Design a protein with these regions (language model features):
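Class I S-adenosyl-L-methionine
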Residues: 1-74, 96, 107-112
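Short, contiguous acidic/charged loop-to-helix segments that flank catalytic cores in large enzymes
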Residues: 43-51, 66, 75-78, 116-125, ...
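Conserved S-adenosyl-L-methionine
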Residues: 56-139
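Short mixed-charge
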Residues: 137-149
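A conserved beta-strand->alpha-helix junction
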Residues: 153-166
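Polar, glycine-rich mid-to-C-terminal structural blocks
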Residues: 168-183, 193
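Flexible, glycine-rich loop/tail regions that form catalytic "lids" or insertion modules at the edges
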Residues: 198, 203-206, 231, 237-238
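Conserved helicase/translocase motor-coupling segment
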Residues: 203-222
């Protein structure tokens, strides 16, 4: 049994009743990247194209050891790939009733048109990452879960993009007569109300994972973030 013990900004790993370092070489069958990596991913997404992704348990066990009793921990994987980390976090939550969250980062690296994933409709690695999370979540919900678990396998996809605003306030020396109307309506024409909402959330430092709903008030679409913690409407009044 591995249990973490915080020591300042680091952790000691408790093994049974003694302390020791985590093994640097894992030979248990559960860490086999073919059986619990390649085959597992292909069982969720046939022809995923990933060769020897990490074993689910090779991520699950360190996450369990490091987060320990902190069941609200946030786990960041800056190279999501086949999204093994997301799968492991959801599985661990299902096993111990935790509410850990994951942040997966993946560039939309294109997939070769001649490869199986492309022929199955996946054009980027990021698309496979997202689909693995969806299907892994569904599979976990079908299995045996901790009675106290919230059964939350949802996730939100955010993409890095340019600003929603026209570049009008950043060139004071270049402001001309033709730019004056842009100081009144400075939102780019192709941006949606959802785009504007998330820019507000970012600017105000609001948690991007909070629940968002929409309603109609006097014929206008209104967004409600976390109930009524933030209410926003992005309708131009002319």
């Amino acid at each position: 049994m591995l249990r973490p013990k915080r020591s300042g900004e680091s952790y000691q790993i408790e093994i049974g009743k003694t302390f020791g370092l985590y093994k640097s070489v894992w030979t248990d069958k559960r860490y086999d990247s073919n059986e619990y990596g390649t085959k597992l991913v292909n069982s969720l997404i046939e022809g995923s194209g990933f060769t020897f992704p990490k074993s689910l348990w090779a991520v699950y066990d360190p996450v369990e050891a490091v987060t320990g009793k902190d069941k609200d921990a946030i786990i960041l994987d800056f190279f999501a790939g086949s999204a093994t980390t997301a799968h492991a976090v959801m599985q661990l939550n299902a096993d111990d009733g935790g509410n850990r969250q994951f942040i997966m980062v993946q560039v939309p690296a294109p997939i070769d048109e001649n490869l199986s994933p492309y022929k199955r409709g996946f054009t980027t690695i990021a698309e496979i990452s997202k689909e693995r999370i969806r299907r892994a979540g569904e599979k976990i919900l079908e299995g045996e879960c901790h009675a106290g678990w919230k059964r939350d396998v949802g996730f939100r996809v955010l993409k890095v993009d340019t600003s929603n605003m026209k570049d009008v306030f950043y060139r004071p020396n270049g402001l001309g007569q033709q730019d004056l109307l842009d100081t009144v309506e400075n939102t780019k024409a192709d941006r949606t109300p959802e785009d504007l909402l998330f820019q507000v959330l970012l600017d105000w430092g609001v948690d991007l994972t909070l629940p968002i709903s929409r309603g109609i008030v006097q014929g206008k679409t209104v967004f409600f973030v976390d109930g009524d913690a933030l209410v926003a409407c992005f309708v131009s009044i002319r």
